[in-house]
Curated annotation (Swiss-Prot):
Propeptide cleavage-removed residue intervals: 19-26, 59-60, 93-94, 127-128
Organism: Anemonia viridis (Snakelocks anemone)
Entry GO terms, CC: extracellular region; nematocyst
Protein name per Swiss-Prot or TrEMBL: U-actitoxin-Avd13a/b
Keywords tagged on the record: Cleavage on pair of basic residues, Disulfide bond, Nematocyst, Secreted, Signal
Family of the protein in this entry: Belongs to the sea anemone BBH family.
Function: Inhibits ion channels.
Positions of disulphide bridges: C33-C45, C36-C52, C67-C79, C70-C86, C101-C113, C104-C120, C135-C147, C138-C154
């Protein structure tokens, strides 16, 4: 029994030593598609009903984009790795909020934030004091009245 254990232990040590010299590759998921999706020949994520239970289950709502965490869908529909969304060294600017108006405001056709009384209770409530500028947190109103992202007001590194 001891000899079997010693042989097993020796084999494990040899395998461990052999694996030490290998170069570690980053954790790139290939394909980068979510569960129930596979990557086709052109790199797009397509739904794989057989990988998700086939005819026994209904096809779930299609996830758009169907990319896994840490991936974003580019303009051609491919899932590409987004290192900043996955703990990259620099902090990314947040996704731009569109429209960037505060609660009770909507963006008109020219991009200005205007008060929407119906979105805030309509005739039942008084119109609150107008917030000037009516932009959300991290946004400021420029000279033409549009809300633009202000990275310094959102924790950006100061000079």
């Amino acid at each position: 029994m001891k000899s079997i254990f010693l042989v097993f232990f020796a084999v494990c040590l040899v395998k461990a030593e052999a694996g030490k010299g290998r170069k570690r590759e980053p954790n790139i998921i290939n394909p980068p598609c979510r569960e129930c999706y596979v990557q086709d020949s052109s790199g797009n994520c397509v739904y794989d009903k057989w990988g998700c239970g086939g005819a026994r289950k209904r096809e779930p709502n299609i996830i758009n984009p169907p990319c896994r965490e840490c991936y974003v869908q580019d303009s051609s529909g491919n899932c590409v790795y987004d290192k900043w969304g996955c703990g990259g060294a620099r902090k990314r600017e947040p996704n731009i909020i569109n429209p960037p108006c505060r609660e009770c405001y909507v963006q008109d056709s020219s991009g200005n934030c205007v008060y929407d009384k119906w979105g805030c209770g309509g005739a039942r409530k008084r119109e609150p004091n107008i917030i000037n500028p009516p932009c959300r947190e991290c946004y400021v109103q420029d000279s033409s009245g549009n809300c633009v992202y202000h990275k310094w007001g959102c924790g950006g590194a100061r000079k």
